[in-house]
Design a protein with these regions (language model features):
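Short, small-residue-biased leader/transition segments that mark boundaries at the very start
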Residues: 1-2
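Eukaryotic nuclear low-complexity, Arg/Ser/Gly/Pro-rich intrinsically disordered regions
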Residues: 8-9
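A cross-kingdom feature marking charged/low-complexity
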Residues: 13-20, 26, 31, 79-98
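Amphipathic, hydrophobic secondary-structure cores in small proteins
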Residues: 35, 39-82, 86
Length: 98
């Protein structure tokens, strides 16, 4: 004999979340007083495959504005990019868009 209570049915229900799975996550690089601008440009080219011009644009945004969103997409890939940037000793974070 199988009895189901309302409490049990409630615990088995799918959790309600406001975050959609397809919401893009941002990879943000922050300015630091250590790395040379040419080095940061080179890292962007290697990690993201950016052209020199696009890499320089992001580097200058980091330099003058203090941060730049260098990539946006699925969370797993964004986490991977943040780890790669940390490997090059850049200050990078993962942010969920508002």
């Amino acid at each position: 004999m199988l009895f189901r209570s309302a409490a049990m049915a409630e615990t088995l229900a799918e959790p309600k979340t406001e975050t959609r799975l397809d919401t893009p996550w941002n990879v943000v690089v922050h300015n630091d007083p250590v790395n040379l601008m040419s080095y940061v440009t080179m890292v962007f080219q290697k990690v993201f495959g950016y052209s020199r011009e696009k890499a320089q644009t992001h580097m200058l945004e980091v330099h003058y504005r203090g941060r730049s969103i260098v990539w946006s997409g699925v969370r797993e890939r964004a986490e991977f990019y943040v780890q790669q940037l940390h490997g090059y000793l850049l200050l990078a974070t993962l942010e969920k868009p508002e």
